A protein has these predicted regions:
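Conserved post-Walker A coupling segment in P-loop NTPases
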Residues: 1-45, 49, 55-71, 136-141
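Nucleotide-binding/hydrolysis machinery
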Residues: 10, 16-23, 72, 91-101, ...
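Conserved helical "switch/dimer-interface" subregion of ABC/ABC-like ATPase nucleotide-binding domains
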Residues: 17, 77, 81, 89-90
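Structural recognition of the conserved hydrophobic beta-strand(s) that form the central parallel beta-sheet
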Residues: 27, 63-64, 100-107
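Conserved catalytic core of Hanks-type protein kinase domains
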Residues: 56, 81, 104, 126
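Catalytic acidic motif of RecA-like/P-loop NTPases
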Residues: 68-69, 79, 83
Length: 179
């Protein structure tokens, strides 16, 4: 889905309702890191030691946001870990077994990246078992009332104060031309 449609919230909801809910939820923004840094983050290091994101997500969920930005090398590493269930830290030869749910996310069509040769076809088929497209808010206006109520509930819980929204403010939100 487009930026800001709630992909992270959906991924966390999937995690929280799954058998992995008691395990960790590890999130990686693939666009924010250079290919070298993302490889280091995913694989970890024995120097330090710095566990891999795969290890940190063991028995939980690894969420890769903006997966279309992964380099070919990182795609190969990810595919290998998914197929073998083993990770080797970047400066080691030791195989570490890992088990995690992978949720990947993109703001554009991964299928188009595959057709252009910019994304591994093999990895695409490995990660696209259950595709969910989240439409932007402008296409699901009927969700607004529930979202407003959920946000108010969340802030009431956080602040332990009673909060309400005025009818005028509610109308402004419901009538706003959302992107």
């Amino acid at each position: 889905g487009e930026e800001g449609v709630g992909k992270l919230s959906l991924a966390m909801a999937i995690h929280n309702e799954s058998e992995q809910r008691d395990g960790p939820f590890i999130s990686v923004d693939c666009q924010m890191l250079s290919p070298e840094n993302i490889l280091h983050e995913l694989l970890g290091s024995d120097v330090g030691p710095s566990p891999s994101k795969f290890e940190l997500a063991h028995n939980g969920t690894l969420y890769l946001d903006k997966v279309e930005y992964l380099s070919g090398e990182v795609q190969s590493v990810l595919l290998k870990v998914l197929k073998t269930g083993l990770v080797t830290r970047s400066d080691s030869h030791r195989l570490i077994p890992v088990r995690f749910r992978l949720i990947t996310c993109t703001s554009s069509s991964l299928r188009e990246y595959v057709q252009q040769g910019a994304f591994s076809r093999q990895l695409y088929y490995e990660i696209s078992m259950n595709e969910i497209e989240i439409p932007p808010l402008r296409k699901r206006r009927e969700d607004l009332k529930q979202m407003i109520d959920d946000i108010i509930d969340k802030y009431q819980e956080r602040t332990r104060k009673k909060m309400t929204i005025t009818p005028d403010a509610n109308s402004v939100l419901l009538e706003y031309r959302w992107p």
